[in-house]
Amino acid sequence: MGWGQVDTVVGETRANVIPLHIKRGRVASRRRAGYRVDGSRQHPSLLSDLRGRASAEQIAAVVREIDEHRRSTGATNLWEVTTEAPLSELAQHVAAVAGFLRQRLTGDYTVDEFGFDPHFNNAIIRPFLRFFFKSWFRVEVSGIENLPSTGGALVVANHAGVLPFDGLMLSLAVHDEHPAQRDLRLLVADMVFDLPVVGEAVRKAGHTVACTSDAHRLLAAGELTAVFPEGYKGLGKRFQDRYRLQRFGRGGFVKAALSTKATIVPCSIVGSEEIYPMLTDVKLLARLFGVPYFPVTPLFPLAGPAGLVPLPSKWRIAFGEPIYTTDYAATDADDPMVTFELTDQVRETIQQTLYRLLAGRRNIFFG
């Protein structure tokens, strides 16, 4: 029956109990034998004699091993040997998150009249964009020294790529590559601010509506400002027209620069045209959804949401020689001939730089 046996003697029933300590003794003997056999394969710190006490030789071996590892890592104690590296990295992340939450909850941050929130920008937006900048598009920047360290300046760049990744990469390039780590304030189409979540994030990143009045206010305040004069004509052009600049509007950006005496810096971006190669624009669907264009690319809409992932083209951003406006008269901002000539000069500079960058490119994805 497993626990005992029952005997019947002349009508009397007696139970013979089998002592369990007999089996326990046998099991313990087998375990001790196994320990002696496997002991040679265990770490010295796990070895012990039958009475559970470590020998002096075993303890000395463990101490020597710890001392050797401590000397090789430069640690001063056992805690540093075992936990310092992983915990310091984890502690940095925890401290960063805790610091961000504390400042947001206590209101210990500032927002300017345009909605620019430097604290949110540095903690959330820029770290997210750096993955695309460094690992996905592998952006190379040249001519960053042409941007002033202080004071207002207007960066004028070509626009392409269906979605405005070029503006995001340009703003990050200025902050991360410029010695002064300046904030670049983009002039953005008003439709963007009507988008849920996106519009609020764009304002927190320091950008504002693309209009002459806002451009004038930013430049007059000494802000580094960027404009894409091609607008939707450049952003939504077909792949066959890549790197061919579209018309630069009516020259409103030149008027703002002339009236504030701000320096104009031409900027050429190569790589943005290939992230969403637009084969055609379905205008009927664009009108139906109320958007400037409805792109058809090799992956969108055929691949569904996967088609929204930009292709990892190799990018180059080149800042050209600055064009100074200090020698222009105050009335030149209202002179159509002056604004037209200056607009054409900026446009031609960007176009020729694009041709030069393309001539030195061997591969779309590897540069």
Swiss-Prot record:
InterPro entries the record matches: P_lipid/glycerol_AcTrfase_prd (IPR016676), Plipid/glycerol_acylTrfase (IPR002123)
GO molecular function: acyltransferase activity
Pfam hit, one: Acyltransferase
Record-linked CDD domains: LPLAT_MGAT-like
GO cellular component: membrane
Family of the protein in this entry: To M.tuberculosis Rv0502.
This protein's name: Uncharacterized protein ML2427
